[in-house]
Amino acid sequence: MPELLKERVETCYQQAETFFKRPFPRPEVSFKLRGQKAGVAHLHENLLRFNLQLYRENQEDFLRQTVAHEVAHLVAHQLFGDSIQAHGEEWQLIMRGVYELPPNRCHNYEVQRRATTRYIYRCPCPQGDFPFTAQRHKLVRQGRRYLCKRCRAILVYSGETRVE
């Protein structure tokens, strides 16, 4: 686990403990998060998950804003219980009062989309190319058939692929 992030989680908890004058249990920290989310707080498991790729690409802002954002969710839940809204007044109070940060709901990190392979199927129609996903291509190989909506012919794999 990146040490700077672990240290920032601890710093956020120390700030919350000083502000609220009470201790908070420390969460488990995981980097098993992919896709568009920078972080997720699992309230009942006392677990923080962070996106390692987004952390590496946006380290300074991630440490300052994202870590505090997720810790604030756990602190708010431990202080106010289940009945609060995720980005409601209580969470905003913690972001502004404890961490002196804007209570931004979402990050604006650039997220690289994964390249996907499309399998090109054809029919006799003009503009008769149909890009299939890997899952649909596998179903065809297992015997499923797909028809062109215009000419009702069975779509046939052309042997071509395209990366998008």
Swiss-Prot record:
Its main location: cytoplasm. Binds 1 zinc ion. Zn(2+) binds at residues 69, 73. Its cofactor is Zn(2+). It is found in: Cytoplasm. It comes from the Bacteria. One of its GO terms (biological process) is response to stress. Disulfide bonds: none annotated. The active site is at residue 70. GO terms for molecular function: zinc ion binding. Keywords: Cytoplasm, Metal-binding, Zinc. InterPro entries: SprT-like_domain, Uncharacterised_SprT. The keyword Cytoplasm applies. The keyword Cytoplasm applies. Residues 14-156 form the SprT-like domain. GO terms for cellular component: cytoplasm. PANTHER family: PROTEIN SPRT (PTHR38773:SF1). Belongs to the SprT family. This is Protein SprT.
